[in-house]
């Protein structure tokens, strides 16, 4: 499944099932989303949650406006999630979506590390033991 689809499904699930955030908040951080806009929405959602507020579309949108008005305007708010709200039928899958996002994030981190190590290997005089 495409990363953006999973990320949108998770965000929609969090709005539909307020209990899911309890399981997801310890697993994901905003920077783990491949789409920075999704991470921005998640950050606004979790910031509200951490202040003991029940996040909904209106509160999250207001939080986004406060956090970064320019970014909020550039991305057009969270209106594009409204389509996803109609397609996400099983909000109980939020934890599975979060685990998949986490898995993709770990793979991206590993890829970045391997590219860095490959670059080190190609430099003259590199000690192979230090690279490993």
Locate each region found by the language model:
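Noncatalytic partner-interaction/assembly domains of nucleic-acid and motor enzyme complexes
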Residues: 1-105
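Hydrophobic alpha-helical hairpins/lids featuring a short glycine-rich hinge
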Residues: 106-114
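Non-catalytic interaction/clamp surfaces of large macromolecular machines
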Residues: 112, 120-132
């Amino acid at each position: 499944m495409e990363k953006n689809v999973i990320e949108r499904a998770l965000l929609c699930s969090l709005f539909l099932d307020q209990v899911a955030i309890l399981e997801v908040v310890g697993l994901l951080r905003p920077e783990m989303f491949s789409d920075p806009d999704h991470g921005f929405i998640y950050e606004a959602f979790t910031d509200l949650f951490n202040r003991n507020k029940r996040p909904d579309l209106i509160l999250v949108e207001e939080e986004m406006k406060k956090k970064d008005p320019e970014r909020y305007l550039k991305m057009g708010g969270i209106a594009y999630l409204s389509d996803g709200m109609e397609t996400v039928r099983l909000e109980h899958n939020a934890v599975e979506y979060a685990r998949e996002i986490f898995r993709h994030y770990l793979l991206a981190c590993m890829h970045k590390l391997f590219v860095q190590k490959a670059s080190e290997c190609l430099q003259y005089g590199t000690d192979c033991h230090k690279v490993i």
